[in-house]
Amino acid sequence: LGECEQYYKDRDFHFSRYEIALAYMALGGIPYYMDLLRNDRTLAENIDQIFFKNPQIKQEFEDVYMGLFSSSEKYVDIVVELGKHKYGMTRKEIADAVHTTSGGGLSTMLDNLQQSGIITTYPRLGGKRKVMVYQLVDFFSLFYLNYMHKHKTPTTGWGALQRSPQFFAWAGLTFEILVSQHIRQLQNALRIGTVTGMYNWRGMTDDGDGSQIDLVIEWHGERTDYLCEIKFSENVFAINADYKQALLDKISAFRESAQHIKSHSILLVMVTTMGVKRNVHSGCVNLEVTL
């Protein structure tokens, strides 16, 4: 993000950091698409021109995989399925979805996708055992699959879409991925030394509801677990009574889980686009990181 910010400054763009993040979430920092941006257009107008008014965009999506892999159709099938599951899929789930075996051929394709930076793997903890999950993290592919795959191209412009539930679902996921790709910067902001563990956590609250923590960072040197709630918002985010209770329930569920080392303290971190509004409910947040 820092490099993108400098790129825009050098070319006389005056995007806010919120817009720089949005551009990154759509274009993925790909130089080819960044070079198509014009500083006499708004970000919305630029995205309209690059994506929604570009009849070749489907071919460009397929060309990405044709240029990287032989048997590109099989790779595209995997990517399309992963695009339907925002928090990823296990190897068996992928094999079932693309109608193949969970053998060497699939392993090779998953390894190739991971080495190219299109997907990533991470441990999901909170159940009886650790599960490795494959997640699509290529921003261009996520944007294409969300808005244009199978003739989904919207008739309204990008500006209008930014008020839609579809936009906030896409933005919420891609902002989490954006944060995960800037872990070093997050560590620096939190003044964390050597990280001992980092993972997504799922568990159950006392009332039996499912609970998820977007990112857990373990720092054994300070005997502290940082529970990171990652929140995309176009404005300063206001925590209300219900949201505060949900956060406290997550902390309680994690504290009682097998993953939490009982001698460790817990710090709740809000990672947001625009910051957290100070109000009667925001005191539960121990640390805050913004763009």
Model-derived features with residue positions:
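Domain-level recognition of nuclease-like catalytic cores that cleave nucleotide substrates
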Residues: 262-291
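Accessory nucleic acid-recognition modules appended to NTPase machines
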Residues: 31-33, 37-39, 43-213
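Mg2+/Mn2+-dependent nuclease catalytic core
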Residues: 233-253
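Conserved small helical "lid"/interfacial subdomain of P-loop NTPases
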Residues: 1-19
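Arginine/glycine-rich "motif VI" loop of SF2 helicases in the C-terminal RecA-like domain
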Residues: 249-264
